[in-house]
């Protein structure tokens, strides 16, 4: 399994709105340890918040879904970065919302057999992912309407630079959450005050 990743910021830099962030993040390549991964994700959030102190994304369903997670209802999974609301689980099909709090980020991960599609519904953030024919991780902005398809073996990571709501549809032959290969995980953080309550 590959554990050192150069980062390709060309797509991020192509948008004048994000060129400065791309330039500064370029100095943090490669990601080759848990420490460098966490430093990259934290710095991405810091630079984003400096560039966009009022944010650029809008949310409508985020607070309602986050409340479901915080009240630990059935069909939810609480995480350090926010949580998951499961809307369909008919093996091997899984559909769920990923509710990523501002400054939260998921592990850099891949799957052996799971095939997943992500649709960004609300908020804004970044995604790191490795296209099948590339060696580097591509860095792109996540905004409503963005879609991604990750075939088995494709590394990826979501960074919630702002509150972020992503819908995931997957075919998960091993069973839900049984095919998670973590390359680098977020450092443990204390649960922050929900962004909608600030």
Label every model-predicted segment.
Residues 97, 117-119, 162-186:
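A short hydrophobic beta-strand segment most commonly corresponding to one strand
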Residues 94-114, 142:
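Conserved short histidine dyad/triad with adjacent acidic residue
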Residues 131-155:
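Short acidic-glycine-tyrosine-enriched beta hairpin
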Residues 153, 172, 189-196:
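Beta-strand/loop edge motif enriched in small/polar residues
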Residues 1-94, 107, 140, 183, ...:
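A short, N-terminal "cap"/entry segment at the start of jelly-roll beta-barrel domains
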Residues 158-160:
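Asparagine-centered strand-capping/turn motif at beta-strand->loop junctions
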Residues 102, 112-132:
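Glycine- and acidic-residue-biased ligand/ion/polar-headgroup-sensing regions
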């Amino acid at each position: 399994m590959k554990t050192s990743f150069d980062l390709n910021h060309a797509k991020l830099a192509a948008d004048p709105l994000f060129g400065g962030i791309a330039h500064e993040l370029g100095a943090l390549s490669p990601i080759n340890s848990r420490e460098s991964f966490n430093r990259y994700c934290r710095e991405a959030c810091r630079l984003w918040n400096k560039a966009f102190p009022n944010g650029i994304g809008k949310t409508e369903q985020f607070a309602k879904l986050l409340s479901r997670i915080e009240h630990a209802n059935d069909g939810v999974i609480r995480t350090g970065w926010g949580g998951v609301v499961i809307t369909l689980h008919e093996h091997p099909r899984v559909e769920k919302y990923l509710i990523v709090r501002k400054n939260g980020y998921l592990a850099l991960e891949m799957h052996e057999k799971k095939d997943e599609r992500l649709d960004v519904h609300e908020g804004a953030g970044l995604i790191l992912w490795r296209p099948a024919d590339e060696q580097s991780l591509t860095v792109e902005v996540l905004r409503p309407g963005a879609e991604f398809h990750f075939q088995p073996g494709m590394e990826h990571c979501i960074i919630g630079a702002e509150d972020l709501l992503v819908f995931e549809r997957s075919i998960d032959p091993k069973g839900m959450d049984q095919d998670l290969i973590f390359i680098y995980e977020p450092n443990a953080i204390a649960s922050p005050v929900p962004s909608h309550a600030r």
